[in-house]
C-alpha cells in the first residue's frame, strides 16, 4: 500500500503535467499569449502561462494521495487550497499586471486554508534556542508571513530558462527526503512534495534551455507557495529557512533597486550572457564571474541551491508531532 501511495501520485502528476503543458503551448500560441525571451540574441516569442500545466499535474497527483493515504485528509486539502489561491492570484497578475504594492500582500489570503485546517505546529525548534511555543501567534502571524515570503521571494529569482523550475525541484527534493524519512504529517508532506517534483520535472522538459514555454507568475507564485505550504504542513521550518537563503540574498539585491531590478542578462554576439552594471540579482553575480551560456548560469545556480538543500537535510531539527 505504501508503494502504491508513492507510485500512483508521481506517475499521474508527471503525465497530466506533460499533456497539459503541450496543450497550453498550443493554445498560448494561438491566442498570442507570448513573451520575449530576453536572453536570446533574436529575442524569440515564447508561450506564457506554463504554470497551468504544473498546477494541473500537481492537483491530479495530490488528489490520488487522498485515495491511497486516508490519514492525509487534513494536510493535502490545506496545501492544495493554499497553493491554488496563490496560483489564481498569479494568474490575475499575468493577465491584468497587478501593481507590485498590491501583489506583495495578496499571498496573505492564501494562508487561510492552512490556518483553518490548523496545519503545522505552534512549537518550533529554533537552532541554538530550542523549542519555542508561539501559540495563537503561529496561526495569525507566522503562517501568513511565511507564505507571503516564500511565494514572493521565489518569484524574484527567475528570468532564465529552467531556473525557477529547477530550483523548485531541488528544494522540494530536500523536503521530500526529510518527509519520507519521518512519519505522520511530515511523511504526508513528503508525499505531496514528491508529487510536486514529478509535475515540475515534466514541465522542465519544455522549460529547460532553449525554453518552449515560460511558467509565468501563475507558475512561480504557485511553486513558491507550494514549497512554503509543504514546509509548514510538515513541520520542516529549519529546512525551509535554509533552502531560502539564496532568495534572501536575492531580496537584498532587489531591495537596492527598489525592486525594479531584473534577473536576465545582456547577450553578446556569441550568445553568451554578461552584466556590466551593478548586480541586481544572483544571476548577475554569476555572469560577472565569466561569460557563460544561459544554461551554464542556470546550472551554477542549481548547484548552489543543491548545497543548501544538503545542508537543510542535515540540519533539519523540527519537532515531529504525529
UniProtKB/Swiss-Prot annotation:
Its EC number is 2.7.8.15. The chain crosses the membrane at residues 5-25, 46-66, 76-96, 102-122, 123-143, 160-180, 186-206, 222-242, 295-315. It holds the Pfam family Glycos_transf_4. Belongs to the glycosyltransferase 4 family. One of its GO terms (molecular function) is glycosyltransferase activity. Inhibited by tunicamycin. It is found in: Cell membrane. The keyword RNA-binding does not apply. The keyword Electron transport does not apply. Its main location: membrane. Keywords: Cell membrane, Glycosyltransferase, Membrane, Transferase, Transmembrane, Transmembrane helix. This is Putative UDP-N-acetylglucosamine--dolichyl-phosphate N-acetylglucosaminephosphotransferase. It is a multi-pass membrane protein. It catalyses: a di-trans,poly-cis-dolichyl phosphate + UDP-N-acetyl-alpha-D-glucosamine = an N-acetyl-alpha-D-glucosaminyl-diphospho-di-trans,poly-cis-dolichol + UMP. The gene is gnpTA. It comes from Saccharolobus solfataricus (strain ATCC 35092 / DSM 1617 / JCM 11322 / P2).
Amino acid at each position: 500500500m505504501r508503494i502504491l501511495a508513492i507510485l500512483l501520485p508521481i506517475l499521474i502528476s508527471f503525465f497530466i503535467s506533460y499533456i497539459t503543458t503541450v496543450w497550453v503551448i498550443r493554445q498560448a500560441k494561438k491566442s498570442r499569449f507570448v513573451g520575449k525571451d530576453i536572453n536570446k540574441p533574436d529575442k524569440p516569442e515564447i508561450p506564457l502561462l506554463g504554470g497551468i500545466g504544473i498546477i494541473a499535474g500537481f492537483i491530479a497527483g495530490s488528489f490520488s494521495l487522498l485515495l491511497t493515504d486516508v490519514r492525509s485528509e487534513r494536510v493535502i486539502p490545506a496545501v492544495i487550497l493554499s497553493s491554488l489561491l496563490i496560483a489564481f492570484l498569479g494568474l490575475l497578475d499575468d493577465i491584468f499586471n497587478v501593481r507590485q504594492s498590491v501583489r506583495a500582500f495578496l499571498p496573505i489570503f492564501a494562508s487561510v486554508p492552512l490556518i483553518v485546517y490548523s496545519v503545522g505546529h505552534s512549537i518550533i525548534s529554533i537552532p541554538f534556542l530550542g523549542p519555542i511555543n508561539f501559540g495563537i501567534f503561529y496561526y495569525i502571524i507566522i503562517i501568513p508571513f511565511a507564505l507571503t515570503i516564500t511565494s514572493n521571494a521565489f518569484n524574484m529569482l527567475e528570468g532564465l530558462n529552467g531556473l525557477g523550475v529547477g530550483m523548485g525541484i531541488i528544494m522540494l527534493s530536500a523536503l521530500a527526503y526529510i518527509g519520507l524519512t519521518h512519519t505522520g504529517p511530515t511523511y504526508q508532506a513528503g508525499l505531496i512534495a514528491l508529487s510536486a517534483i514529478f509535475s515540475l520535472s515534466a514541465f522542465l522538459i519544455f522549460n529547460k534551455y532553449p525554453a518552449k514555454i515560460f511558467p509565468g507568475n501563475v507558475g512561480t507564485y504557485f511553486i513558491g507557495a507550494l514549497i512554503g505550504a509543504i514546509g509548514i504542513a510538515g513541520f520542516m521550518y529549519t529546512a525551509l529557512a535554509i533552502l531560502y537563503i539564496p532568495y534572501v540574498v536575492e531580496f537584498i539585491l532587489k531591495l537596492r533597486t527598489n525592486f525594479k531590478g531584473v534577473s536576465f542578462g545582456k547577450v553578446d554576439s556569441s550568445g553568451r550572457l554578461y552584466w556590466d552594471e551593478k548586480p541586481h540579482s544572483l544571476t548577475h553575480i554569476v555572469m560577472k564571474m565569466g561569460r557563460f551560456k544561459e544554461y551554464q548560469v542556470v546550472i551554477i545556480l542549481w548547484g548552489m541551491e543543491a548545497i543548501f538543500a544538503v545542508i537543510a537535510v542535515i540540519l533539519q531539527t523540527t519537532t515531529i508531532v504525529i
